[in-house]
């Protein structure tokens, strides 16, 4: 697999950090949006590396892509509409579901790290 260690590290940090930011009801800040944009690029780099790797990694690729796309909806809402928009669309009742996705992501990213 292509060397994407830095993308893995950055994406992992960003997903975990952004979840905590939203869970703790912190206001939107410009740096958050920049991190969000860069994280999506890192996601695509990792996705491409998995696509170019062996066929045996395709189930991992599918799980990774589905999981991150589910997380992306939460981050996108916050990036586009701030905390107020996030709370209006998802509210506190969605935080446990979001957290479960982040925990699943953390496990998947460890599997990808093991390929490096």
Task: Please provide the spans of the model-predicted regions.
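Amphipathic alpha-helical binding modules
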Residues: 69-116
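Generic detector of well-ordered alpha-helical segments enriched in charged/polar residues
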Residues: 5, 9-12, 16, 62-65, ...
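Extended amphipathic alpha-helical scaffold segments
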Residues: 12-19, 40-47, 71-83, 109
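Short, solvent-exposed, charged loop/turn and helix-capping segments
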Residues: 42-66
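Charged, low-complexity interaction regions
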Residues: 20-33, 51-58, 80-95
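Short, flexible coil/linker elements and helix-boundary hinge sites characteristic
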Residues: 20, 37, 51, 57-59, ...
């Amino acid at each position: 697999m292509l060397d994407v260690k830095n993308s893995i590290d950055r994406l992992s940090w960003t997903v975990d950090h952004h979840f905590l930011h939203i869970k703790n009801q912190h206001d939107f800040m410009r740096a958050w949006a920049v991190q969000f944009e860069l994280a999506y690029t890192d996601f695509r780099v990792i996705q491409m590396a998995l696509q170019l790797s062996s066929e045996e990694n395709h189930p991992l690729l599918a799980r990774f892509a589905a999981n991150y796309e589910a997380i992306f909806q939460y981050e996108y809402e916050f990036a586009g509409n701030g905390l107020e928009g996030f709370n209006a669309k998802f509210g506190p009742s969605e935080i446990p579901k979001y957290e479960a996705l982040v925990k699943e992501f953390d496990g998947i990213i460890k599997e990808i790290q093991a390929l490096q």
